[in-house]
Amino acid sequence: MAVPARKTSKTRKRNRRGHIKLTVPGLAPCPQCGELRKSHMVCPSCGYYDGKQVVENN
């Protein structure tokens, strides 16, 4: 089996993992109530999507 000839330094390890990170979800304000919601999803607070009420919220 192959074995590394030298210890991988912290810098090389971090450079290799530089692209592995969390992404921020795309949030947009709801045009009806102004609350933040995910883009292209029904607003969880008011139940509107594309100017129409889709879900009943009590």
From Swiss-Prot:
Pfam families per UniProt:
Ribosomal_L32p
One GO molecular function term of this record is: structural constituent of ribosome
Q: Which GO terms describe its cellular component?
A: large ribosomal subunit
- Does this UniProt record's set of keywords contain Transmembrane helix? no
Source domain of life is Bacteria
Similarity remark: Belongs to the bacterial ribosomal protein bL32 family.
Q: Which gene encodes it?
A: rpmF
This chain belongs to the protein called: Large ribosomal subunit protein bL32
Which HAMAP family does UniProt cross-reference here?
Answer: Ribosomal_bL32
Could you provide one GO biological process annotation from this protein's UniProt record? translation
What the entry lists under NCBIfam families is as follows:
rpmF_bact
Q: Which organism is it from?
A: Limosilactobacillus fermentum (strain NBRC 3956 / LMG 18251)
Q: Which InterPro entries match?
A: Ribosomal_bL32 (IPR002677), Ribosomal_bL32_bact (IPR044957), Ribosomal_zn-bd (IPR011332)
